[in-house]
Structure formats: C-alpha cells, structure tokens
Amino acid sequence: MGLSIPLIPGVLATALAAQGIRKRSLSPSGGLAAFIVGYLMMAVPFRGFGVSLIVFYLTGSKVTKVGKQIKGSLEEGHDENGYRSGWQVLCNSISAFIASCLWAAMFSPESIHSYLFGSFLPPHLSWHRANFSMDMTCPLNPHIGGGWSRTLVLIALGHFACCLGDTMASELGILSKSPPRLITTLARVPPGTNGGLSTSGTLASLAGGVIMGLTMFTSLMVESAGCRTDTGKHLASTVLAGALGGLGGSALDSILGATIQKTDFSNSTNRIITDETKTKPREVGEVKTISGLDLLSNNQVNLLSSMATGLALGWLA
C-alpha cells in the first residue's frame, strides 16, 4: 500500500491561485493559502469537497463584482475585486478544510492526508478508520465509519453554505433599494451595516445555501454508485442542509455582526467604515457608531459563524 499523490489537484490549485492573484481577488498570501487549502481539499478521493471549494470560490468572486460601483459608494475601503488575504481565505475555508482532511485520513489509507494526519487522529476516530469504496457505499451512509463519513461531509456542506450564503447576502443585499433593518432591534440602518437584514439579502443567502447543496448532491451522484440507489433521499437531504446552512449561517453571522462587531458610519461621506478602510476616522470626518461592540473583526465573525454552522449540521447528521 503506497502513498498516492495526485497531480491534477496540484495543477488546478496552482491555476486558481494564480488566477486569483492576477485578477487581484487574492493577495500573495491569499494565493499561497488558497493553493495549500485547494490542493489538499481537491486531493481528497471524494471530490465533493474540492468541487464545493471551487464552486464557492468562483461564485463568491463573481458575486463580489456585482454592483461594484454602488457598493464602493456605500462603504469606505471597499475593494471591487474582493482582494482576499491569507487570513480571509482561511476564515472562509478552515472548517471544511479540516473536515475534508479528516475524511481522507479516516477513509482513504493511501491518500496524502492519511500519511500527514493519520497518526494524529484521536482514538475515537482511529477506531473507525476504513478503506472507503465509492462504488459500494455512499459517503452520506450513516452506518459507515460510525457515522463519521456523513458527519464530515455535512460539516463541509454547512461551512460552504454559510460562507456562500453570507457572501451573497452581504454583496447583493447591499444593493437593495430599501434600507435594511438591524436583526436585533429591527431599526432601519444604512446599507452595509453589520447585522442588517433585507429581503433581497435573505433570499440571496438561501440561494447560496441551495447552490452548495446542489453542488454536493451532484458530486455524490457522479462519483458514488452507492448514492445513486436513493437519489431522491440524497437530493432532499443535501439541498435542505444547504438551505439551512445558508439561512441559518447568515442569520448567525448577522447576530454576531450586530452585537460584537462594531459598525461605524461617516457623516461627512455618508459611508460605512469597514475593516479595510485605510483612512483614519478623524480624517474621514465625523463618525458615529451604529451598532455593535468592538470585539471581533469581520473575518473573525465569518470564522465563528461558518464553524458553528458546519458543526451544527454535522451534529444533526
């Protein structure tokens, strides 16, 4: 039994990272993080993890460019290209990254993940290690590996559903013609306020979750003969899980954003001051706080909400 190091995932990860740097959707550190995360996720024998990452990255990058001029007029420091650092890449991938690496380490003995992480698995996970056959069984089978295969797949799905749902809600919801309402008080707030809700943003978060659910379902149907024996059941479970992850994750992100993430507004420019604002507040003009305590940054809120959503769906598995 030898080590298997797939080359195609390396080529794809390199191409996506290079494209991101070239188009300025990724910083150099973001490109490096995207390559590492992308390669290890796409190298998992069950390609649903890697495909979900690609769909999230490409869809999220496209969405950030929608209405870029309008968003630039509403937010200080807005980057129309979505220039993501290595930290931002990790915040938007870490839960799914860990889940995918654990899945490969547990169920693919010849994978690079098994060689890198297999010896570090805790006893209760090592006990369920097995050589998984996509032709014979479905990764969503609750009886495989003590249920860990299904749990890890749904953690990854929940993570990406939350992240894409929140991305679509924040990037498209800000374009709503009616002002959003703060999730905690329902007071009207300026577009771009952390924790602000709008009808278009809520629908966008649902759409993002459904997209990720359909992505995972399609991967399961293409790869696993075991999953094709019960198509309707798996379609319902993945789309429902994606929808819950998109809506629930975005709602959790909004609650955290409205309470423990500070939102400041410049009266002189009539724009929200974001984490990326380079001009100091005293240079921007008179600033007022709209909501939230200055405890977490936007990236930290995204990290917490995506982790919680992924773990919740995994627990419900």
Give the location of each predicted region:
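Hydrophobic alpha-helical transmembrane segments
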Residues: M1-A317
